Amino acid sequence: MKIWVDADACPVVIKEILFRAAERTQTETILVANHAMRIPPSKYISRLQVSSGFDVADDEIVKRIAKGDLVITGDIPLASEVIDNGGQALNPRGELYTTENIRSILNVRDFMDTMRSSGVEMSGGPPPLSQTDRQNFANNLDRILAQNKAG
C-alpha cells in the first residue's frame, strides 16, 4: 500500500502526521501538488509536481493509484474516483470515505454546489481543523496502516 496525498489543499499539520507515520511504518508516501513543496529527507516520502490546471493533481493520483492504496484528500469527487478504482480515501478531518457513504456525501456536495451556483447565500466554508479533527485523522490513519500491515 502507498499513501497518496492531494497536497495542494492538505493542511500542514496533517502532512506532519503523515510524515511521522510514513517513517514509523515504512510506508511509501507521495505528495502530489501543482507547486513546489518542502518535504523532509526520507526514503519513504516523495513529491510529485504536476502542471497547474483544474484537477491535474487529482487526475494524476487517479491514474497512479493501485487497489488498496490510501489517498488523503478533502476533495469528494476525487475520493469517489479513488473508491471506484479500489483505493481508500481519508479526509484531513479523519473521515474515511467508503463505498457505503461516498454516494450520499457526493450528493450533498453536489446539492450545495447547485445551491451556491443558483445564487443562494451559503455561510462560509468549513471551520478550521480542531484538535479533535487532528486526533481523528491520526487514529484512522493508524488503524488503516495497522490493517494493511496485518494483511
From Swiss-Prot:
InterPro entries: UPF0178. CDD domains: PIN_YqxD-like. Pfam families: DUF188. PANTHER family: UPF0178 PROTEIN YAII. Belongs to the UPF0178 family. NCBIfam families: PRK00124.1. This is UPF0178 protein PSHAb0045.
